[in-house]
Amino acid sequence: MRFLLIDRITELVPHKSISAVKNLTLAEEYLADHFPGFPVMPGVLMLETLVQAGGWLVRYSEDFAHSAVLLKEVRAIRFNNFVSPGNTLKVDLTVRKQDGALWEFNGTGTVNGNSAVSARICLEALNLADRNPELASSDSARTESYRNIFQQIWTPPA
């Protein structure tokens, strides 16, 4: 199963910051098991929402030069509140440091202004062909796919 957890990017400043939202609905299949009778977004998916938002900032900042943006490290993660169906998880990330392919962020997720998750994350941008030249065509296909998704979730201000 593939999770696209960013419904909309609300603010984007290349190389600096991103804000985005995830609207949680009962249609999310994983809620049937997490937890029966008390559906809440799993903490790992709250973290993944931060990771995906950071990935969009990296891709946009680098004009989609890399086909993969992967989680390298998580530090100081805190889960403070539940995210329930009907809630909107608003995530905000700011760049702490960027060194070559590595991007470090401070990230927070809030529901109605109350902290739900916070973490420091490190992401690595790469192309599959860097590790296996036979995967160059996969890089192109992935990049094109990400560009198409990005156009659906981000509308630049007029």
Walk through the language-model features, giving the residues of each.
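Hydrophobic beta-strand-centered segment that forms part of the acyl-chain substrate-binding groove
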Residues: 54-90, 116, 124-126
